[in-house]
Amino acid sequence: MSELFSRRLALLGEPANQSLLRHCLHGIERECLRVDAAGELARTPHPAALGSALTHPYITTDYSEALLEFITPAETDSAATLAALERVHRFACAKLDGEYLWSPSMPCPLPAEEDIPIARYGNSHIGRLKHVYRKGLALRYGKTMQCIAGIHYNFSLPEELWPLLQRAEGDVRGVRGVRDFQSERYIALIRNFRRYSWLLMYLFGASPALDKSFLRGRPHHLQELDAETLYLPWATSLRMSDLGYHNNAQADLTPCYNDLASYTDSLRRAVSTPYAPYAAIGTQRDGEWLQLNTNVLQIENEYYSTIRPKRVTASGERPIQALVARGVQYVEVRCLDIDPFLPLGIDLDEARFLDAFLLFCALEDSPCLAAGECASCTGNFLKVVKEGRRPGLHLQRHGQPMPLAAWAGELLERLQPLAALFDRAYGGDGYEKALHAQQAKVADPELTPSARLLATLRERGESFRAFALRQSLAHAESLRARPLGEEERQAFEAEARASLAEQAELERRDTGSFDDFVAAYQASIQGDGG
């Protein structure tokens, strides 16, 4: 344990600071495909009973019209976050007529590319911009790839923590420097996340198999489990592997996480720099928009990463602008698979473990990534998603081979005092129990969700698609068996109606042409200070 880590732990453990961790904020976004009773992709529009996907605060769509996304408010207790996620699931399940939420991350059998519906957001300029952006994604990466679903976990440390740490560490930049100190600490968290996120893939990866149709006949290195199912025997998360997808445009885009400025500069260049193959296609054909621009990235969010530094944006503000103007506010973890054994795709044990893991990443010493270390982090991550449960698997640590099981055990041991801090802050032993559940998975890989999924397929002689549909129907039944109370149901219905009215108002208020709107949106990223 580093001296710096010990000092920070001791500071948080002081009686006056013990309650601080109760002010962490936790939010969850869960994506899931809508399917029909046969487990085929729903071709119906986003249900009006769920409100407007453009303006509803808790229910939207991601890439496809059939790819729902449920969003919780930021809560000070992970248990409250999970409760909010469950409420929105119960509401949605009650409103889906003959349709179901697909339980795993990897998609159901998909129709031909041209028949996968891209999400629509109405006729306002901002609604059309979101649709054209998704058309651009189809052009660049194909629609099939965009139908993979995941869990995003948003986490922030208490605002009061930063000046406390800053003073304790002798940082004399004063009040104005707190924002920069906070951003530096979040970027340091992200560096450590890059070093250790392979552990999350081992513990929570839940996509070792997929439906054969997903690969569309492309060459691959997967094995056949049955006539409909492909898999890798030791894989944890095929979702986070390359699966044969290579996007050359993003290959050279490796934002440096050594400071916020280099990260935002790297993204700004990517959203401003033309990429020849995209330029050859152009933005419009016969007056129809094909993509927002021909740059490496159309917008910042197109960059695929396992974790992002975030700041809540004002209306009309872009993510880079918000980060440059006000610094990092929270992180968004983006590498989590949906657990198909759980109705919500995530449970409280996982959320609590993530809290402790992210606090560890924030407090642990985090030097800048040395030459070659980035490649080593990526290598470890890819190794674990493809063969994380292989007996005797070694990863690279400081240029030396290290057994995964030993390193994982060591990391979990170091999380013990952080789990204890959270339990002291909240009362009870929920965090310690969550940690023990993960230690059991390291001791016995058969307890991991990836191993459990493959064991279930083998024991039942079941294909991936049959298993996934069975789980989807079972989860729908359990959620529908506990309908919302009348008051909660009415509140959700009112929210849905209000969102539809808000979308209509946006459409009514729009002025000028869509072309001018896109041009102004593009221009907003150029020449920002920072």
Curated annotation (Swiss-Prot):
- Which keywords, in A-to-Z order, does the entry hold? ATP-binding, Glutathione biosynthesis, Ligase, Nucleotide-binding
EC number(s) per entry? 6.3.2.2
Which PANTHER family does the annotation name?
GLUTAMATE--CYSTEINE LIGASE
Q: Which organism is it from?
A: Azotobacter vinelandii (strain DJ / ATCC BAA-1303)
Tell me which family the UniProt entry assigns to this protein: Belongs to the glutamate--cysteine ligase type 1 family. Type 1 subfamily.
Could you tell me the gene encoding this protein?
Answer: gshA
Protein name as annotated: Glutamate--cysteine ligase
Q: Which InterPro entries match?
A: Gln_synth/guanido_kin_cat_dom (IPR014746), Glu_cys_ligase (IPR007370), Glut_cys_ligase (IPR006334)
Q: Which GO terms describe its biological process?
A: glutathione biosynthetic process
Q: What's its catalytic activity?
A: L-cysteine + L-glutamate + ATP = gamma-L-glutamyl-L-cysteine + ADP + phosphate + H(+)
Name the source's superkingdom. Bacteria
Which pathway does it operate in?
Sulfur metabolism; glutathione biosynthesis; glutathione from L-cysteine and L-glutamate: step 1/2
Q: Which GO terms describe its molecular function?
A: ATP binding; glutamate-cysteine ligase activity; metal ion binding
Output a single Gene Ontology CC term carried by this record.
cytosol
